[in-house]
């Protein structure tokens, strides 16, 4: 069996490589996908991809495995970054990492390489099960690290080629393995935030592409102007961080895109404004549910799932009814559907209802 392993320079993908070698696989080649934007944005952040490659080189030498660097910066910019910028302009909250997996790691990568592989292995925290050539995507054992949310827009064809050997391991177990086999990157910290930014702050990325524009911050209940902000694109519904006003905490409740106004409420009023119903569209089903029971939804990456019912309306719009209120539902975000621990697929949030 011919196997390609995507190495990031981090501990997870390195342990994934070790796991495959331990299982006896020998025909292995590793790839590092260069998608960082630091070459373009070097003035606002450090450049971690050189450090990544140093670790990739060390790990591959340790296991005597060849590797190749694949440059996907142009593809990433055209297929993911432009999407994120357009969503921000519209006042939406994009999820670039979902499209990074769908369009780049398991999309453009296949197009770029000249070799064919039986299996693509990564260090993602998720599980793929195959029963009689019927593939399902499931949550990882480690529910805190689980990445099924970000894999929800893969196709069945993409999933059929993938293997995630870390799906049955906890992060603590992976760290332990890294120390036991003395990996060169055993003490390297986990990457944080959006996959292409590295050490660049998200707001700096937004500022670089969209600039700043002064606008008012208004208390939703009273209409009183409480302060100013530098552009609606820096804010998302439910956001608390960055609102530096007294008598808080304050939360973003609404955005007026045309007039560049951010509406906020304090914590007492904010907790009265949760939503139980919203519409989604552009659904990607990995496995469409046959029955409308035992379903749950994730509105954002994290452990929390909320039980729900779904109803298909015209034009393939779906109404989602949550069993409990959520306080940060924002257009442009993705709602991912689950049946127990199986990730069924996901859809883009269109608007909230009640």
Swiss-Prot record:
Subcellular location: Cytoplasm
Reactions catalysed, as given in the entry: S-sulfanyl-L-cysteinyl-[protein] + uridine(34) in tRNA + AH2 + ATP = 2-thiouridine(34) in tRNA + L-cysteinyl-[protein] + A + AMP + diphosphate + H(+)
Gene3D superfamilies in the record: Adenine nucleotide alpha hydrolases-like domains (2.30.30.280), HUPs (3.40.50.620), Translation factors (2.40.30.10)
Chain spans, region Interaction with tRNA: 145-147
Signal peptide residue numbers: none
InterPro entries noted in UniProt: MnmA-like (IPR004506), MnmA-like_C (IPR046885), MnmA-like_central (IPR046884), MnmA-like_central_sf (IPR023382), Rossmann-like_a/b/a_fold (IPR014729), tRNA_2-thiouridylase_MnmA (IPR051305)
Keyword vocabulary terms for this entry: ATP-binding, Cytoplasm, Disulfide bond, Nucleotide-binding, RNA-binding, Transferase, tRNA processing, tRNA-binding
A Pfam family assignment: tRNA_Me_trans
An MF annotation (GO) of this entry: ATP binding
Top EC class for this record: transferase
Any one of the GO BP annotations: tRNA modification
Catalytic residues of the enzyme: 100, 195
Catalytic activity, EC: 2.8.1.13
Entry GO CC: cytoplasm
Disulfide feature: 100-195
Binding site for ATP: 6-13, 33, 123
Residues marked Interaction with tRNA (site): 124, 333
Protein function: Catalyzes the 2-thiolation of uridine at the wobble position (U34) of tRNA, leading to the formation of s(2)U34.
HAMAP family assigned: tRNA_thiouridyl_MnmA (MF_00144)
PANTHER family found in the cross-reference section: PTHR43052, TRNA-5-TAURINOMETHYLURIDINE 2-SULFURTRANSFERASE
Family: Belongs to the MnmA/TRMU family.
Name of protein: tRNA-specific 2-thiouridylase MnmA
Lineage: Bacteria, Pseudomonadati, Spirochaetota, Spirochaetia, Spirochaetales
């Amino acid at each position: 069996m011919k196997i390609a392993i995507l190495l990031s320079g981090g501990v997870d993908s390195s342990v994934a490589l070790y796991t495959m070698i331990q299982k006896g696989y020998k025909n292995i080649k590793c790839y590092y996908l260069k998608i960082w934007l630091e070459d373009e944005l070097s003035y606002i952040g450090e450049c971690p991809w050189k450090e990544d490659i140093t670790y990739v080189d060390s790990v591959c030498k340790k296991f005597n495995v060849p590797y190749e660097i694949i440059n996907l910066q142009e593809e990433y910019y055209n297929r993911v970054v432009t999407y994120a910028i357009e969503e921000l302009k519209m006042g939406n909250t994009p999820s670039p990492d979902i499209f990074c997996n769908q369009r780049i790691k398991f999309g453009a990568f296949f197009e770029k390489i000249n070799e064919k592989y039986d299996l693509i292995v990564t260090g993602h925290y998720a599980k793929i099960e195959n029963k009689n050539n019927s593939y399902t995507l499931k949550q990882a054992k480690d529910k805190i690290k689980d990445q099924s949310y970000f894999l929800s827009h893969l196709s069945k064809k993409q999933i059929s080629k993938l293997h995630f050997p870390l799906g049955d391991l906890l992060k603590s177990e992976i760290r332990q393995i890294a120390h036991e086999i003395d990996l060169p990157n055993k003490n390297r910290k986990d990457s944080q935030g959006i996959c292409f930014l590295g050490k660049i702050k998200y707001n700096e990325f937004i500022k670089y592409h969209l600039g700043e524009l002064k606008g008012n911050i208004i208390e939703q209940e009273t209409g009183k102007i409480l302060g100013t902000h530098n552009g609606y694109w820096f804010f998302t519904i439910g956001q608390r961080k960055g609102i530096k006003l007294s008598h808080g905490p304050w939360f973003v409740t609404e955005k007026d895109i045309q007039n560049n106004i951010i509406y906020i409420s304090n914590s007492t009023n904010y907790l009265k404004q949760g939503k139980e119903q919203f519409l989604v569209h552009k659904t990607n089903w990995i496995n469409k549910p046959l029955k409308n029971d035992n379903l749950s939804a994730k509105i954002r990456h994290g452990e929390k799932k909320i039980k729900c019912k779904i109803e298909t309306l015209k034009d393939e719009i779906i109404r989602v009814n949550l069993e409990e209120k959520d306080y940060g539902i924002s257009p442009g975000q993705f709602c991912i559907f689950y049946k127990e621990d199986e990730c069924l697929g996901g859809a883009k949030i269109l608007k909230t209802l009640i």
